[in-house]
Amino acid sequence: MSGFVFYIVEDEQLKAAAKACKNALLCYSNYHFAREGGYFEPSAEANPFLHTWSLGVEEQFYFLFPLVAVLAYGRGWLKARYLGGFVLVGLAISCFMTFQYPIRAFFALESRAWELGAGAWLAVAVARGTLPGWLSHRAVAATSLVLLLLSVVLLRNGDLVPAPLAALAVLGAVLFIGGRAGGSGSRLHGIFASVPLRFLGRISYSLYLVHWPLIVFVRSWRGELTPAIAAGLAVGGAHMLWAMLESLPARQAQLARRVWDKRGRA
């Protein structure tokens, strides 16, 4: 992927792309882009590694949170109510940073950790059986979808992101997933379990990896894209990446099980 990116980038942008690539490999690209300027700056939009900023946030969280969770578990602190407190404190910090240091707030772990922490709260609540019963009410699914749609409609070039606007998306996702985990039989959950949406869910990680480099490449070659063409290219590229690379370990494991079963029957 990196070699392909360096092929498509203009000479004057090559240095910026190389620096972003290095920081992405170090799981630090979010802070790199925070130093370089805003997400919506023209120079940033031409960088094929721009999308790696959120991977940096995730990787930093996934490295630090398990360490904290192990320590908390040993002291009996790994409980949903404590994680809920962490999310609320993180949201308050995020609101402060959004208004005082908007560029850093957009990219930084300290202003984004509460979003991932909300998912951790949900996982612990489900595992410990402390999920609120009202989450399984069918009206919760409709409310969650409204919140998710509002978070998209109200987004304007990063205004009030990550807080308080991102709280709509986070709360909507928690309500939707929590409702399904709580046994809700909402029709909305059935729709989202349909084959086309499950397909998008299956390739979602590959979709995130390929969408931005593909868009940068086609823009540099053919100019601006319509949303439909951009989406089609991204989904097609993501499916290829998923089929050739991401699903390979699962296919190998399945093949190994078949070989083992045949030997067991022999």
PLM feature spans:
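Membrane-interface helix/loop caps of multi-pass membrane proteins
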Residues: 1-258
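Internal/C-terminal transmembrane anchor helices
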Residues: 258-266
